[in-house]
């Protein structure tokens, strides 16, 4: 099965929204409340992504992974670090991959695309917030980031951990 990655475009919103919902429901089962996950809809996520794409600027880097029949099976979203609090240039905002495609190095391909975009735009470091109980945090940890913070999100009752790669040129895939 051939999977390739490319820059995301507005026409990808429906596919990105579907991956976002489906991957949340599998990734966060048992971490977020069932009721919370059950109430996430494709329509909500599509609207969220429409808003994100409307705010498009040159400091945002978005890529999708798709099958040979152009079905989107994953995405990554990143850009300039949003808080300014962690002395990091860039931030990985989100990366999601449908469960059946995990473990096939597709996430690494997406991550490499984001890293290349950041490096090409003179960024040296990258921040990511990860739900602490998310087993997928191992994906980030294998690239040896520095753990720099934690915070508790009251609204959804979960803890997040912030990781930073201080020199993204040294991340080895």
Where are the regions that the model predicts?
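Glycine-rich phosphate-binding loop
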Residues: 101, 105
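Acetyl-CoA-dependent GNAT
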Residues: 7-11, 21-31, 37-100, 111-113, ...
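Conserved catalytic-core motifs of GNAT/GCN5-like acyltransferases
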Residues: 127-131, 141-162
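Conserved hydrophobic beta-strand within the GNAT/NAT acetyltransferase core sheet
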Residues: 92-95, 126-130
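Conserved N-terminal entry element of GNAT/NAT acetyltransferase domains
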Residues: 1-14, 169-173
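Terminal substrate-recognition subdomain of acyl/acetyltransferases
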Residues: 158-173
């Amino acid at each position: 099965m051939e999977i390739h990655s490319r820059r995301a475009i507005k026409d990808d919103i429906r596919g990105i929204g579907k991956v976002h919902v489906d991957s949340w429901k599998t990734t966060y089962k048992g971490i977020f409340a069932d009721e919370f996950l059950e109430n996430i809809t494709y329509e909500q996520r599509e609207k969220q992504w429409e808003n994100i794409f409307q705010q498009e600027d040159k400091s945002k880097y978005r890529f999708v992974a798709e099958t040979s029949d152009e079905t989107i099976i994953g995405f990554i979203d990143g850009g300039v670090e949003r808080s300014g609090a962690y002395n990091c240039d860039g931030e990985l905002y989100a990366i999601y991959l449908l469960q059946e495609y995990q473990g096939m190095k597709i996430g690494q391909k997406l991550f490499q695309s984001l890293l290349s975009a950041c490096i090409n735009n003179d960024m040296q470091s990258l921040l990511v917030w990860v739900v602490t109980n998310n087993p997928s945090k191992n994906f980030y940890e294998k690239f040896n980031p520095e753990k720099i913070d934690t915070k508790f999100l009251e609204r959804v009752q979960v803890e997040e951990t912030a990781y930073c790669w201080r020199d993204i040129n040294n991340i080895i895939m």
